[in-house]
Regions:
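Conserved N-terminal beta-strand and adjoining loop/helix that marks the start
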Residues: 1-17, 68
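A short coil-to-beta-strand element that immediately follows conserved catalytic motifs
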Residues: 58-68
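Conserved Nudix-box catalytic region and its N-terminal flanking loop in Nudix hydrolases
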Residues: 13-54
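Charged phosphate-binding loop/patch that engages nucleotide di/tri-phosphates or the phosphate backbone
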Residues: 116-139
């Protein structure tokens, strides 16, 4: 069985996350976290940074591993590595997706995701309360 490594990023800004709607292919209209395939010689983090630059024209400032999912499709094993990521800017245009949506975790279930991305949504909901900015100590 052929293995394919894929990365995706949960871009967080202003207590919202970015999701993207597929514009082409068998899964047209489904939502996903932006990302793509890892190229030969690339680390997962390098691939994610490259994909965000290519697909969203933004530079990531921070990337932290969140979860790994394995999916089987058409005789292929797809390893999906998901990262929490941050950037100083927001994407201004759709390059490969039909639309980009900023949503709160409370409304993320309103969107039709790929099965593997649904697993990532669950993981995001588990860690979201920990992502609030810590209070400053008086000490």
């Amino acid at each position: 069985m052929k293995k394919i490594k894929v990365v995706c990023g949960v871009l967080v800004q202003d207590e919202k996350v970015l999701i993207a709607q597929r514009a082409t292919g068998d899964s047209i209209g489904k939502f996903e976290f932006p990302g793509g395939k890892v190229e030969i010689g690339e680390s997962n983090e390098e691939a994610l940074i490259r994909e965000f630059k290519e697909e969203l024209d933004i530079d990531l400032t921070s990337v932290t591993f969140l979860e790994k999912c394995v999916d089987h499709q058409a005789g292929k094993e797809i390893e999906l590595y998901c990262f929490l990521c941050f950037a100083d800017q927001k994407p201004e245009k759709c390059i490969v997706h039909s639309q980009l949506v900023w949503t709160t975790p409370e409304h993320i279930y309103d969107y039709d995701f790929f099965e593997s991305d649904r697993t990532l949504v669950q993981k995001l909901m588990e860690v979201w309360p920990c992502m609030k900015k810590p209070m400053k100590s008086k000490f």
